[in-house]
Amino acid sequence: TNRAIHLNDGEICILKDNNVKVLDEKGKEAIKEERAVDWSIEDAEKSGYQHFMLKEIHEQPSAIYNALMGRISEIEPRINLEDLESNMDEITIVACGTSFYAGMAGKYIIEKLAGTPVFIELASEYRYFGRKSGTVIAITQSGETADVIGAVKEAKKYGCHTIAITNVAGSSITRIADIPIYTRCGPEIGVAATKTFTAQIAVLFLIALKLGMKNLCISNGDLQKYVSSLRRLPSYLEEVLGRENEIMDVAGKLKDCESVFFIGRGIN
């Protein structure tokens, strides 16, 4: 089936042969709306790949295309993104795991392109150390990460505007945050994240561009160049994935190393 009922905290679902009943915290029947889930059986198959992670690495070009689709326009330089809070003078990003690394990249991009100060906190630490003002951007692939949900609830208690970047429509985070922004990658089964990580960075880049235009940090000409580059991004990814054999050779040389140093600067 592609039909689902989403449960809220404290609700109980009773499944019988021909009946589904949902009870609220007080034991009273709750009227729930069925929603269509955008997925196909092919999403849960390896489609000839050795494992799901390899499949999802190769799905990155289409994932980036879907994340950008309808959100960028070259005809008239514009970022068509969900309505963002007009006053985003200060941003805190909360996330866990791979999404936290996407947030680190997002901090660099937003500060560079929009001039907006960005703070980043592990979601599990936000309630203790995080800033309780401005806009909070929560990043979670599943939309169900407990620490991220807890951080958003904490932020809302202090009146923060909240944005959720997630991959799953109807997930818990989308019902809590003020604005959900979907990465639209399709199911990701492999761990650690692959296509959802790159799509999260793409969405953060769009946020940076929109803020950069609002803050007068980016000209129309600059935006045109960025949008043109974003449109070519799926083909760039295809080009890199076409060098898989070379990459496998390098991986083969590294696989038995006891330690590896990654050295970079800036966003790297």
State each model region's role.
Residues G97, S142, L241, R265-G266:
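Residue-level marker of alpha-helix boundaries and capping positions
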Residues G115, K255-N268:
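Acidic catalytic cores of enzymes that act on phosphate-bearing nucleotides/polynucleotides
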Residues T1-S86, S99, Y108, K112-L113, ...:
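N-terminal segments that mediate ammonia production and transfer
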Residues S86-R232:
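Glycine-rich phosphate-binding loops that contact phosphosugars or nucleotide phosphates
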Residues S133-V136, L254-E258:
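Bateman (tandem CBS) regulatory domains
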